[in-house]
Curated annotation (Swiss-Prot):
Residues 19-31 have a biased composition (Basic residues). Induction: Expressed in the early phase of the viral replicative cycle. The gene is OPG051. Residues 16-31 are annotated as: 8 X 2 AA tandem repeats of K-N. This is Protein OPG051. Residues 19-38 are annotated as: Disordered. It comes from Vaccinia virus (strain Copenhagen). Keywords: Early protein, Repeat. It comes from the Viruses.
Length: 92
């Protein structure tokens, strides 16, 4: 199991869409289903707690998710759509 933390909704921020809508904020929080399904490179606000350095002593916790690595691809994580059935939420 891997512990990751971040926002409760994965925000897909494809570089192409980010540059296209740079000055327009109307589509900034929309996840594009086509982008996620095609496996395009995206970025999410998640940190793997197993990879944190010891120097990062202060961590601000949001919801934590336990993800079964055998069933999920951590690089294309889309919590709302793809991994609803494999996630257990832990709140502090």
């Amino acid at each position: 199991m891997t512990l990751v933390m971040g926002f409760c909704c994965g925000r897909f921020c494809d570089a192409k869409n980010k540059n296209k809508n740079k000055n327009k904020n109307k589509n900034k929080n929309k996840n594009k289903k086509e982008d996620v399904e095609e496996g395009r490179e995206g970025c999410y606000n998640y940190k793997n707690l197993n990879d944190l350095d010891e120097s990062e002593a202060r961590v601000e916790f949001g919801p934590l998710y336990m993800i079964n690595e055998e069933k999920s691809d951590i690089n294309t994580l889309d919590i709302k759509r793809r991994y609803r059935h494999t996630i257990e939420s832990v709140y502090f």
